[in-house]
Amino acid sequence: MLPKLQPKYISFDAYGTLVNFQMSPPTRVVFADRIGEDQMDEFLDDFEAYRGDEVLGAFKLYPQLVKDALKRACARWKIEYKDSDGEEIVAVVPTWGPYPDVPDALAKLAEHYPLVILSNASEDQIYSNVDKLGAPFHAVLTGEQAGAYKPQFQAFEYMIGKLGCDRSEILHVSSSLYYDIMPAHHLRFTQKVYVNRGFEWVDNAATVSPFNYHEVSDLSGLPDLLGL
């Protein structure tokens, strides 16, 4: 049975949950001269996988993490990597805005709860994205502040310490099982909502019960879950 949602704080992943994550379009443009269109999706998958591996290593600022993941993907594909490739892709991150379902939902939630962001982001990127969300946030917490990225436990423990509350009082919301829902579960966050934007393959029979989360298809469903 899923736990009743009665949070003191609602924390959110940013990129891919609130902010429309758009790293693939500029990557397609940058590498159009080196990767055929019929292979581009596979290259993008590898780039994503290396980002997922890079967050587990020694801390580095997010722009450098993206560049290093891109460099590793290029090495795997035996194609040239140029420093300008990574710079061009990283430069678009602060331009990303919210998904269409986000502003109204956040505005409604902000009337009842203090909202928090916990993002794998650098300080010089995230605030431009947050400004576009149009809602007040009690705290914006980043990987740069924590010295670690999700899914590392250190990032979540940093948030718990900054909020000064018990983890049972935090409702954590994310579109990623890998980066957020699974580590939050292992850290015994009892209140979790998975925003299923279709990024990750989910076998409901295999995952929902072990990780004990509520699920919505987009953020507009979250106020309803909370009875607002």
Predicted regions and their residues:
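N-terminal helical cap/lid subdomain that shapes the substrate entry/recognition surface
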Residues: 2-100, 124
